Curated annotation (Swiss-Prot):
Glycans are attached at residues 145, 374, 478, 528, 542. Expressed by the venom gland. The lineage of its organism: Eukaryota, Metazoa, Ecdysozoa, Arthropoda, Hexapoda. This is Venom carboxylesterase-6. It catalyses: a carboxylic ester + H2O = an alcohol + a carboxylate + H(+).
Amino acid sequence: MYMLKLSYILLFLGFVKFSWQDKQVPKVSTFTGNIRGYYKKSRSDRLYEAYEGIPYAQSPVGKFRFQPPRPIKKWSKDLSATKKSSVCMQYLMTFTTHGNRVKGSEDCLYINIYVPVRNNRKPLLPVMFWIHGGAFQFASGNEANETLFMDRNIVFVAINYRLGPFGFLSTGDIVVPGNMGLKDQSMALRWVFNNIKSFGGNPNKITIFGMSAGGASVHYHYLSPMSAGLFKRGISISGVAFCPWAQTKHAPEKAKKLGALMKCRTDNTKKMIDCLQSRPARIIAQAVGDFMFWLYNPFTPFGPVVETYGSNPFISNSPINIINNGQVYDVPWISGVVSKEGLYTAAEFVDNAKLLWHLNDHWDEIAPYLLDFNYTIPLDQHRQVAKKIKNYYLRSGPINYDKVESIIQMMSDRLFNIDFEKAVRLQARINKSPVWTYYYSYRAEHSVSEILSGGSTTDYGVCHGDDIFLTLNSIISNVTKPQDLAMQQLLINFYTSFAIQGIPYIDEASWPSLNPNDPDFRYLHIVNFTNIKMEVNNNFANKSFWKTIPFNENKLN
C-alpha cells in the first residue's frame, strides 16, 4: 500500500513538474512544424513570448548561392527557437569596425517573432514586419530591439535577408537575374502571412516597415507582384525605391569585376558563376570594399535591379514606370525623412580636417561617387556636373569645417530628399489609397552620427536613422532624458497606431494625406514632442536646382 501511495505521489509530482515546465516554454504549431520559444520582459516589465531563429527558407549555399530562395522544408521534431541565428554574410561599413570587416554566415535566412503572452486570447493582433537597413550591404534583423514595441498589443517580426553580392549580384541575364535579397524578404513575408495566425497575429493586418535600404525595400514590395496581397500597409523611413542608391546601375559590369577579383573567367557568365559559387564566402564579402571609390562611397555597390530575364522576376520594369503604369499595390503608405539625412555618409568625414582637405583637393573625382552619379551622367560631363553642384551648395572657397552644414544638406537632397518627394507624389496620384508624408527634426541626446563617425559627439543635426533607432536600437533607445522618453513614446504611438488602425496618429496632430495635385509639398513636421505641425514647401530639397542636372534616372518610358 505504501509503495502504491508513493507511486501516486511521484506520478503527481512528475505531472506538476511537467505542467510547470510546459508552461514555462511557449509553443506554437505552424505549417512547417512545431516551435518552442521562451519568455522575455518588455521595457515596462510586461511578459511576452519570443521565438528566435526560425528558418523561413533553405540555406542558400553551394550551388544555391546567388539563386532565388527555396521554401523551407517541414521539420518533424520541435524546433527550439531560443537563439538568434547568425547575421547574413557581410562587409561592415562603419568607422567603429576594427580589424576584420567581414562577419556572418550564408546560412542566415531566419525570422525572429515576438508576441504578448497569448493566454488563450481570441482577437488576433496586428503584425509589424521589420526590414532592416544597411545600404543592402550590412546589418541584420537581429539588431532590432523589440522591447518597447512589446508594451503594445502587436506582434513584432524581424528578418534577415541576403546582403551585398550574395543578395544583389546580377549578371543581367538568365544565369543570375538578381534581387535575391528582395526575394528573401518576400519569402519571409509569405511565411509570416501563412503562419502568423499560430502566434496570435492577424495575417490580414500586416504592416511592413523599414529604414534606409529597409524603407526602400518596403517601397519595392509595393511594386512587385511577388509580394502583392501579403501586407496591408507600409512605412518607408528614410528610403524609397526612387533613391539613386536603391537602383543599381551597370550590374553586369560589377559582376564581371567581382569575377575577376576572384580569379574567375568572365567571358562566360555560367562558368563565372560556377567559379564564384566555389569561392569562400568571406573572400567574396571582403571584395565589396573594392567597389567603394572613396571611404564607403558609393555605399550601395550591389542593390536592386530591373530583371529583364528569368521566369519569376521581382520587378521587370523601373520603379517609376511600374507606378506610372498603375501596377503598384494599392494600400496605404507612409514615407518620411529626417532633417540631416546626408549625415549618412557625411558623418564619416565632416569631423576630420584631413578628409575634408582631401575632398577639397579631389572634388571633381570624388563627387560622382559621393553623390552617386558615376553611372547616370556621361563620363565626359562628370567634371562639369561636379563643379555645378559645388558652386550651388558650397560656393567659393575651400571645403573645410565652414562648409560642413552645406555638405550635409547637399548629400541629404541628392541621396534622399529629392526622390522622396517624387515617389510619394506619383504614388499618391496613381493610387486611391492615402499616402502620408513627414519630416523629422528632433535631436535626441544620442545620435546615429556618433556611431558612423567613430565616436564624435558633435551635433550636426538629426542623422539618418535617428528617429527609428530611438525606438529600435539597443544603444540609442536606452534613454533617460524626459524629452527623449516622450519622443520615444510618441514615435511608438505613431508606428503602432498605423499598424492597429490603418491611420497614423501623432499626439492629436492634424495630418491629412498628401494631395498630389498641390504644387506645394505638404508634410507633417515633427519638431519635438510638443511641436508637431503641417508645413508647406514649394522648393523642397532645392528641387529647382536639381531639375537642371540631366541625371539618367527615374525616366518614364
